[in-house]
Amino acid sequence: MSLNFMYITNSPTVAEIAENAGVESIFVDLEKLGKEERQRGLDSVKSNHSVQDIIGLRKVLTKSKLLVRVDPIHERSEQQIEAVVNAGADIIMLPMWKTVEEVQQFLDYVNHRCKTMLLLETKEADQCLDEVVRLSGIDAVHIGL
């Protein structure tokens, strides 16, 4: 087993430095829905990244994968995922999922156009994980973040 390093940034300059230092994935964090409420009172960082940041990073990265965390499944997920794919993401991460149906919807929206990663961070997700990992199109599961 090997470690894969990720670095969260929307700065092309910082991303180039990280890539040259061997970081495998440059991470753009678009997750905003419900995040303030979930993390209220915690000493956590909330990124202010955008789809435009993906485009800027795509121009400078040559080795590192471009990983983008989107919002949990919601009424505009299809449009958000479409924009992220079109901007050049290599991997799309789905956070805060709780059901097999949410994961299947995510996979349908991505439609094999890039790699997929599930962020395992809820009790409900853990309870249906055995069924979820049988779905076609999941490339990775990340535990916690």
Regions found by a protein language model. Name each.
Residues 30-33, 71-72, 97, 143-145:
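Short, ordered loop/turn segments at secondary-structure junctions
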Residues 62-95:
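Glycine/small-residue-rich loop that forms an oxyanion/phosphate-binding "nest" at active or ligand-binding sites
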Residues 6-12, 68-77, 96-97, 119-126:
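Glycine-rich beta-to-alpha transition loops that act as phosphate-gripper elements at the mouths
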Residues 1-64, 73-75:
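Conserved N-terminal beta1-alpha1 strand-loop-helix module at the mouth
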Residues 34-57, 74-79, 96-114, 124-128:
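Active-site-adjacent beta->alpha loops and helix N-cap segments on the catalytic face
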Residues 63, 87-89, 94-145:
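Conserved anion-binding
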